[in-house]
Amino acid sequence: MLTIIGCGNLNRNDDAVGVIIAQRLQQYLAQNPHPNIRVFDSGTAGMEVMFQARGSKKLIILDASCTGSDAGAIFKVPGKELELLPEPSYNLHDFRWDHALTAGRKIFGDDFPQDVTVYLIEAANLDLGLELSPVVQHSADLVFAELMTIIQQNVMT
């Protein structure tokens, strides 16, 4: 099972990029369903990520980043690298998807995906608003195309 989860805040411009990509994938899969592919819009609910990922073989997380890199930069990060980060506090008010990776592995063990990839797109504008900036929209289109290839490969297997 492949699970793709989009994260972000739809009311903060580029922060919505992960959710917007996930919604596009959901529209595609509504027309072209496949029983071994699930796509979720988790918004800002990190706890949902942990439960939605459970039972999957492969997990892909989509989100915006704010690292100081060039706007629109795409980072493809193996989940294992993110699990090496310091132990989170697990405060439920601050529980994010990166906490879900660590907690999910501890709680669910082998029932949590071993193969995790995180796509991050560097934001240009995180102010309140409903639009992706042009450079982030372009990067979202590139990530969407790559994910469509991954979906097609999973459909064929």
Predicted regions and their residues:
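N-terminal catalytic or cofactor-binding beta/alpha core of small enzyme domains
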Residues: M1-Q114, V118-A123, L130-D141, I150-T157
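Hydrophobic "lid"/C-terminal helical patch
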Residues: L147
